[in-house]
């Protein structure tokens, strides 16, 4: 495992002794085995740090003092000090961790183990495995309700969302979704669960209390074959009125009215757009474009791309730090 800064990171760190007021966007580069750091104000890459093999999922602790990274091919979750770029230690994650979600208690990490059809729960303080929960085949998407009572794992091959009681670590419901569910998030103060289906080309909206489907969002981009319109990551604005949805190899982001579930617009971005993160002030949206190896910056108010930023090879996940 490479825990030393690259020469690039060392040089760039000299330029970043003072914290950026507008915050940072941290991007995992799946084929470079690095994370890139973008200044959310200047829109420039200011650092790059080495990680384990094939970094994908990425998230911060509540106080932003720790960065968690799924190093999938290293079979571990790495914990980084974002102030130095140093890998502090590894967490026991199970095999091939792809995505995870941090519980609202800021302590328990729920990890999707793609190869083992398991969700692993790890205590980030004691560094112990609390539970391993059997779910469907190829788990990936992870979510947890705002009150912390329910965790979700989506399984790509089983085509289900699995509802987990976080007290007992037991699955209490399974709901069918369209083909190859990739990403899940609780929205509307936890009242709804949204699940994207990459091959199905949809987002399913569930009533979180009853687990019943209440709406389905479909996408149709003029001039692009439906097979290329593959929803993956998505984010809602803080007022939860507008959703932005990454549509994979269609190279577009959809803008959706989150109240009517109608698609309002499609924005052209880089190639194979996968995940996204808002800037800390929520004025910009940063999308990871795997095949083109860059990040597109979208002006949220204007709903238009304003810049493309080159990062590492196959950028995958993104997370913001103020």
Where are these regions (language model features)?
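Bacterial N-terminal signal peptides that target proteins for export
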Residues: 1-8
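Predominantly soluble domains enriched in secretory-pathway, periplasmic, or organellar proteins
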Residues: 5, 13-322
């Amino acid at each position: 495992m490479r825990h030393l800064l690259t020469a690039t990171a060392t040089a760039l760190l000299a330029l970043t002794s003072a914290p950026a007021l507008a915050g940072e966007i941290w991007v995992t580069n799946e084929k470079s085995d690095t994370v890139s750091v973008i200044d959310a104000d200047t829109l420039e890459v200011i650092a790059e740090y080495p990680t384990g093999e094939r970094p994908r999922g990425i998230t911060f602790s509540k106080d932003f003092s720790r960065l968690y990274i799924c190093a999938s091919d290293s079979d571990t979750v790495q914990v980084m000090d974002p102030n130095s770029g140093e890998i502090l230690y590894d967490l026991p994650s199970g095999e091939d961790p792809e995505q995870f979600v941090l519980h609202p208690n800021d302590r328990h990490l729920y990890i999707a183990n793609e190869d083992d059809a398991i969700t692993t729960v790890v205590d980030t303080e004691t560094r112990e495995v609390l539970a391993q929960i059997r779910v469907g085949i190829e788990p990936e998407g992870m979510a947890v309700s705002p009150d912390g009572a329910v965790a979700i794992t989506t399984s790509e091959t089983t085509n289900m969302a699995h509802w987990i009681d976080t007290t007992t670590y037991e699955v209490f419901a399974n709901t069918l979704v369209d083909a190859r569910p990739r990403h899940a998030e609780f929205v509307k103060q936890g009242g709804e669960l949204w699940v994207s289906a990459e091959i199905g080309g949809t987002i399913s909206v569930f009533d979180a209390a009853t687990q019943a489907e209440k709406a389905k969002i479909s996408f149709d981009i003029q001039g692009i074959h439906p097979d290329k319109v593959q929803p993956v990551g998505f984010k809602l604005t803080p007022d939860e009125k507008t959703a932005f949805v990454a549509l994979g190899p269609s190279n577009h982001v959809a803008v959706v009215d989150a109240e009517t579930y109608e698609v309002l617009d499609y924005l052209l971005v880089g190639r194979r757009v996968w995940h996204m993160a808002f800037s800390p002030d929520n004025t910009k949206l940063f999308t990871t474009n795997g095949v083109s190896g860059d990040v597109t910056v979208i002006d949220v108010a204007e709903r238009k791309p304003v810049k493309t930023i080159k990062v590492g090879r196959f950028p995958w996940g993104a997370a913001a730090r103020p």
